[in-house]
Design a protein with these regions (language model features):
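P-loop NTP-binding core
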Residues: 1-277
């Protein structure tokens, strides 16, 4: 009997740095865990930004990371359940990354089925978790393509400023290409406006511009993530915003985003089961 797939895999992607990908991956993941869901976070960035942000300050010293698991997949070796998974105090699991992943990305180029190595690594985990969140590298290289090939949906954090919105076109083209060539079921979960400042006219103007430009074709999340000094401090502390500033507006925003993502996932599940009848 075939086990029906369980986890919803979300790639958090934007080739531009500084848009709040890592912060969103960590806090959305922990927000979903607070709603009672089993969550796996996967760091696909050779800089190990998510790994460090979650408190593993020396990722290069970790014995097993994503590159270890992907190398096994490339060699057609089996991956024991739970291998390389770290447990975080706030109730989520993590597959960490370090600089070895940069070398692995280069060797992927000559690999058969190279776009699907991450998908292969996550195959077993799909049945163990409700959500798998992939923190993508700030580029559109082979690691990001692997993340898009492994994902059910993609969530795009966009910093609320003019230049950030420009790179969005290029990213959307990449998503379309992956959909056409590798992963026809890939959906866009939505655009998440980060570092918003609703107190200034400029901030409101940008948010409105992005909603007008993309809102007709794509979901732009109602919930935005406000700019906050306290949120910027969390990545240095190895704690999520829920630990660092639980009563603050950013914690509230990520909790609300988690609820929005859950509602979307439930809606998708209902649609899929209706189609299957």
């Amino acid at each position: 009997m075939k086990i029906s797939k369980k986890a919803t895999t979300i790639a958090i992607v934007n080739q531009k740095g500084g848009t709040g990908k890592t912060t969103t991956c960590e806090n959305l993941g922990i927000g979903l865990a607070m709603e009672g869901k089993k969550v796996l976070l996967v760091d696909t960035d050779p800089q190990g930004s998510l790994t460090i942000s979650m408190g593993w300050q020396q990722p290069d010293e970790l014995p097993t990371t994503l590159s270890t698991l992907m190398a096994k997949a490339m060699d057609d070796q089996s991956i024991p359940p739970g291998e390389g998974i770290l447990h975080h105090a706030e109730g989520v699991d993590l597959i960490p990354a370090n600089i070895e992943l940069a070398g692995l990305e280069v060797s992927l180029v000559n690999c058969m089925n190279r776009e699907k190595m991450l998908k292969q690594v996550l195959e077993g985990a799909k049945h163990e978790y409700d959500f798998i969140l992939l923190n993508c590298t700030p580029s559109l290289g082979m690691l990001t393509v692997n993340a898009l090939a492994a994902a059910d949906t993609t969530l795009i954090p966009v910093q609320a400023q003019y230049l950030s919105a420009k790179g969005l076109e290029q990213l959307l083209q990449t998503v379309q290409k992956v959909r056409r060539q590798i992963n026809p079921k890939l959906k866009i979960e939505g655009i998440l406006l980060t570092m918003t400042d609703s107190r200034t006219n400029y901030g409101k103007q940008i948010s409105n511009l992005i909603r007008q430009a993309y809102g007709k074709h794509l979901k732009v999340f109602d919930q935005t993530i406000p700019r906050s000094v306290r949120a910027a401090e969390t990545s240095a502390a190895g704690k999520s915003i829920f630990q660092h500033d639980p009563k603050g507006k950013v914690a509230e925003a990520y909790q609300s985003l988690a609820k929005e993502v859950l509602a979307d996932a439930d809606r998708q599940r209902k649609l899929s089961s209706e189609r299957a009848r």
